[in-house]
């Protein structure tokens, strides 16, 4: 997703500097051109050769390196950069950046850069909370820098509090959100449902299905990367939600219906990936049903749950897009086309549970995108790629 993108990582003197090697590796795996600039103090914590080995690029430390091919490298790299992240960012370098001091390769390059700039402070809690440091952070925010709030925990100095640099995965997510995709959903509100609802039989047992929420999560992440404000309504799921999305947790079909209906009017796009129960017990027991309890029959009486997709289709706002999912074991196209018309949806994503690589719990999917105009059959691919294809098709409607 980062092919053709130039990422500059500025590493300062902090014990957390070693973690940036992992971040650099993650970015390279996404085909980014990763360039690392280190302060001299940072080289006391991690060797520049580590970054050169991981990225395939020379690690820059000295502004006046006579052995390097660029005469004015700080300007050349600043022009090429698609994003500049300083992590870990010491109080010293934060102060320099906030006040326009350019006395080394890192501060000189970032002063010349016009790309998005992210800063991840890492220092002792008392240093981080010092009013001077906080003033410098506010000044950088005023100048358009995005500050990544440090985590709290046990610090290398022995103190406990704010000042820990977030884990590389978190920093990676910030970079991905900023430059991974064209922001063709900027300003749009997107609601996505995911996972399996649970319908209570008694306090111990419930009716559910095999949905894990992986497809819904993938779509939520894709929409977030494309600039949308995303609300993810999660039933029972086996995956963590992506960063930068609003998550609402629900249990039953009725819970999900209440949340979706309350938020539907403000959404530009609604995508119903959740496997919502069609039936629920009419009279769930307040106490656990015992096998030898003669007061309970062996038959559980069921009633239909509300059809959320039908409600959305009936109350669809002008310009709003509604996308449903169809899991079939036979007559997939016929049943899914009928569902599209009956529910007044704009698109149905259909998949056949019996096809290898499709369905619940897998990291891949095999789907057909069905609209009133056409059917597009996709080959087996990772669910993140399926998510991108779904959104590409919706945005053409």
Please place each PLM-identified region on the residue numbering:
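A cross-family phosphate/adenosyl-ligand binding-site feature
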Residues: 1-118, 124-213, 217-397
């Amino acid at each position: 997703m980062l092919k053709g993108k130039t990422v500059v990582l500025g590493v300062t003197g902090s014990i957390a500097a070693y973690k940036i090697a992992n971040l650099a590796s993650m970015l390279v795996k996404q085909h980014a051109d990763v360039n690392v600039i280190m302060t001299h103090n940072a080289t006391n914590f991690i060797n520049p050769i580590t970054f050169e080995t991981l990225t395939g690029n020379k690690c820059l430390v000295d502004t006046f390196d006579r052995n390097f091919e660029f005469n004015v490298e700080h300007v050349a790299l600043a022009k090429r950069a698609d994003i500049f992240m300083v992590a870990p960012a010491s109080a010293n370098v934060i102060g320099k950046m906030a006040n326009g001091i350019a006395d080394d390769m890192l501060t000189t390059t970032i002063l010349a850069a016009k790309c998005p700039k992210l800063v991840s402070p890492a220092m002792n809690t008392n240093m981080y909370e010092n009013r001077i440091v906080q003033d410098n952070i506010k000044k950088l925010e005023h100048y358009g820098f995005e500050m990544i709030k440090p985590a709290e925990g046990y610090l290398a100095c022995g103190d406990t509090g704010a000042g820990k640099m977030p884990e590389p995965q978190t920093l990676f997510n910030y970079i991905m959100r900023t430059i991974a995709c064209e922001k063709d959903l900027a300003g749009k509100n997107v609601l996505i449902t995911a996972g399996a609802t649970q319908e209570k039989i008694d306090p111990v047992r419930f009716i559910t299905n095999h949905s894990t929420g992986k497809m819904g999560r993938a779509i939520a992440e894709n929409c977030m990367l494309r600039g949308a404000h995303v609300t993810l309504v999660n039933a029972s799921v086996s995956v963590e939600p992506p960063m930068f999305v609003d998550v609402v947790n629900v249990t039953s079909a009725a819970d999900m219906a209440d949340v979706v209906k309350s938020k539907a009017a403000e959404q530009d796009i609604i995508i119903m990936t959740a496997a919502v129960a069609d039936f629920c017990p009419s009279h769930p027991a307040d106490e656990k049903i015992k096998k030898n309890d003669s007061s309970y029959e062996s038959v559980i009486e069921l009633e239909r749950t509300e059809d959320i997709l039908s409600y959305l289709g009936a109350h669809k706002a002008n310009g709003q897009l509604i996308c449903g999912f169809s899991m079939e074991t036979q007559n997939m196209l016929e049943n899914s086309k009928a569902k599209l018309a009956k529910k007044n949806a704009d698109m149905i994503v259909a998949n056949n549970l019996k096809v290898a690589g499709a369905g619940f719990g897998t990291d891949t999917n095999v789907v057909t995108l069905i609209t009133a105009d056409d059917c597009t059959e996709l080959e087996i691919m990772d669910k993140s790629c399926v998510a991108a294809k779904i959104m590409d098709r919706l945005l053409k409607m």
